[in-house]
Amino acid sequence: MSYFQLEDMLRAGVHFGHLARRWSPKMKPYIFMEKNGVHIIDLQKTLVLADNALNALDAIAQTGREIMFVGTKKQAKNIIAAEAERAGMPYVCERWLGGMLTNFSTIRQSIRRMNAIDRMETDGTYDMITKKERLMLGREREKLMRILGGIATMTRIPAALFIVDIKKEHIAIKEARSLGIPIFAMVDTNCDPDLVDYVIPANDDAIRSIQLMVKAVADTIVNARALKVEQEVLAKMDEADGSEAEPEDPAAPESAE
């Protein structure tokens, strides 16, 4: 069973690629035709590849590991933030800081600083400092939150990345590849699919196309996590039933008179 309907993809404009003169020849296998100077993506191939990608994401999500959502372009950032939060996953929707993956220990220090400022507001520290100092701390926290808020709870590098627009997120791609982290991505006709482990040929500029794909990824993760919880509950119930069942004592032999 497919995660998508062809009609939904058509309505969302998933099939519209870039101008033919801006294409990447490596995307030729995923292009159906050229129309009015624009490449049209072969949605039959998108259906198959999207299903493969979502099946792989489902398997990762069931292990309990995290999948980072990445999309900082204007059309994607709000969608990325909303869907990643719904799925309980880390995300980057503002600027990608160099070293977010390859120098994660340093990034964690900035996250701890942000959390420390939060504690100051609740433990009474704010009452002991000047108004100017409170203002400076507030600005510092706001800046950290804008950039790092989406990964504030992340304690280790993610198991995979899902990316919208691999040309724009080239630093994230480079870092993930250097660490061997699987990359799932919407790949438009002007991109190099060889940089991605799981290619989803799709329009990465139209809001409706982005929404359709990102929502499907989030839905897959939510369902996989729910299944994992259900399986864990059933396993505990089976374990409890097994421990409560007491073996019957064998009948004592009658003594001979």
Swiss-Prot record:
Give TM regions: none
Q: Name one GO molecular function term.
A: structural constituent of ribosome
Query: Which CDD domains does this entry report, sorted A to Z?
Result: RPS2
Q: Which UniProt keywords apply?
A: Ribonucleoprotein, Ribosomal protein
Disulfide bonds listed in the record: none
A Pfam cross-reference name: Ribosomal_S2
The name under which this protein is listed is Small ribosomal subunit protein uS2
Organism (species): Chlorobium phaeovibrioides (strain DSM 265 / 1930) (Prosthecochloris vibrioformis (strain DSM 265))
